[in-house]
């Protein structure tokens, strides 16, 4: 099977790192549980441009260099890689491609999984691409994803989704093309 895997908050615990950075820099006490949507400006009480600037500052910080894998992700990816063709499809902007490659080489050193950047969380002037378009181009049969907008986009385009459960996607209800998973063990057993 051809499987796409999201990076942030599916493979990489980016929200944990982002909140450590944000709480330290802005003297806040946010937890992952507070983030029930991806409207960071509303949660952080700032403008959308300010929220994007804060995220970009985080991308450039040492916190970004110290991100940990999501629990069970490394073992799960190795397990899936033995039986399936894997592709990382991420909303990350291309300007952090080098940091992304370094992280993948550190945590998944013996795997050569291609990475596709869709630039979805980037300034308007950068070319963005829908994850569903990347998945269709790659003939992806299943994507593991946490972002509601990407989940909806993929389901609308008839791509099966394993919804990695996070506070910002709890309102989504399973459908024929959408199944909620809570752990990487759930992911592997659902695919096997």
Enumerate the predicted regions with their spans.
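Active-site neighborhood of HAD-like aspartate-dependent phosphohydrolases
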Residues: 1-51
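Conserved Rossmann-like nucleotide-cofactor binding loop
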Residues: 10, 94, 149
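Short, flexible active-site-adjacent loop segments at beta-strand->alpha-helix junctions, enriched
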Residues: 15-16, 92, 165-167
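Metal-dependent phosphoesterase signature
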Residues: 30, 40-78
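Substrate-recognition element of Asp-dependent hydrolases with the DxDx(T/V) motif
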Residues: 65, 73-103, 116-118
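C-terminal cap/substrate-recognition subdomain and adjoining C-terminal extension
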Residues: 82, 97-192
